Amino acid sequence: MNKKAIVGIFMSILMAGLVGCAGSSDAQAGDDLKPVIYLYPQEDNTEISVSLDYNGNLVDLIPEFNADKTWNVTANKDGKITFEGQTYDYLFWEGD
């Protein structure tokens, strides 16, 4: 994977975190927000590992991890994510 692809992936994850974790005015104190993770690599068929560093209890994952707190996926420039033969628009997690 080249440097541009790595930078693009990092920026996508960073932006997904910022957008997905932005607090809303009706959020209760102590509630965990439920972000989605979008991937937009600069090249099609880019293999990406996305790990989740979360100390709470995971109650929902779409799709389920295929490694220890990690999604190993293939992503395309259009944002489509392929995971074990299925196509997704994003990765989702929910914790409590």
Curated annotation (Swiss-Prot):
The keyword Signal applies. Residues 1-28 form the signal peptide. Keywords: Signal. This is Uncharacterized protein in bglA 3'region. It comes from Butyrivibrio fibrisolvens.
